[in-house]
Amino acid sequence: MTQYAVLIYERVPADELPPEVMAAHEKLPERIAEQGAREVAGLALHPNETATSIRGDLVTDGPFIETKEVLAGVFVIEARDLDHALAVAKLTPIVDGGVEVRPLLGFAVAEAT
């Protein structure tokens, strides 16, 4: 199966997400498996204010772009094809935002020991 990154964009900060949305995130790996796919990894990000951006030699506080929706998290899934990945990504609980799906190039990642 092919690996895809699912980028989660959300306007609501993680610490303000309703409990039912947090519970839905916790159940997401199980729901993904029910669709015949697999979650390889999932990570939530600290708020936008904690980001540091680097462009050439310039280091600045904050993300590259100021937007209403911020990158809140990312997870990696294995799916049969893009259509399957999109169907799985639609399971992502979102309050006010969306997700972006991108196929991964497939570089090997070292396993944790």
Regions of interest found by a model, annotated:
Residues 1-113:
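Conserved, structured core segments of small domains
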